[in-house]
Amino acid sequence: MIPTMNPEDLRAKLIRNFNDAKFEMSDRVPLYDGVQSARLASGTAAEKMGASIDIVPPGKRACPYHFHYVEEEMFIVLEGEGTLRVAGEMLPIRAGDTIFIPPGPEYPHQILNTSGKPLKYLSLSVNAETEICEYPDSNKYLAVSRKKGPMLDGRRMHRVKDDLDYWDGEA
């Protein structure tokens, strides 16, 4: 038997309208300030999917150049024009373009607004239980675990400085 739920609760768990989304403003000066982002999947029944609407002002970037080891991403350009920096290339993007980014070091990526008007797009991703991202421009990496552990509780960003031996610090 299928469990029943009242329609309002069911709608709240399953449906988001990005026209009603609450945006947060970034203040990361100078390249990322003014970027607006609204997370859509938060509070829904989705456990392995992420979605957001992002609005990037002219001359700004949505996030640093990076790649994922596990998660795939898709971006759907809703309004405006810009540039997809990917795999060492600069590719023009415009409203209607759908961008598919597989995981792996072959596809580091970043979306830049190189136009004179706002760039608005929908971001979709799988949310892996654990993930590692690398940031080639700044020589750092991000470790993410959606499971809580004694050492890794959420997100940890580190710069690659030392290459430690496997046994370093062990008794």
Give the role of each language-model region.
Residues 1-48, 134-171:
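A short, N-terminal "cap"/entry segment at the start of jelly-roll beta-barrel domains
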Residues 80, 96, 111:
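Short hydrophobic/aromatic patches on the structural cores and recognition surfaces of FHA
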Residues 34-39, 52-68, 106:
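Conserved short histidine dyad/triad with adjacent acidic residue
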Residues 53-58, 68-86, 124-128:
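Short, conserved beta-strand element in jelly-roll/cupin
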Residues 88-104:
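Short acidic-glycine-tyrosine-enriched beta hairpin
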Residues 103-131:
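Ligand-binding loop in jelly-roll beta-barrel domains
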